């Protein structure tokens, strides 16, 4: 059995919801284990628990397949 390393992606200060959605879709296809959203990068769900329509449309459901977390400070991740 081949041991696979976990791959994470950090998205920092990306303004475009469509670009974030596209990265979720690409990360899902590439087998990324987790995406961290830092700075003002939009999350798939807003602070009220509603899905961001533009991001969800661009991700084609990948936001439900790839684990993600929002972090205020990128330096706490590095």
Model-found features: residue ranges?
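RNA substrate-binding interface of SAM-dependent RNA methyltransferases
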Residues: 2-78
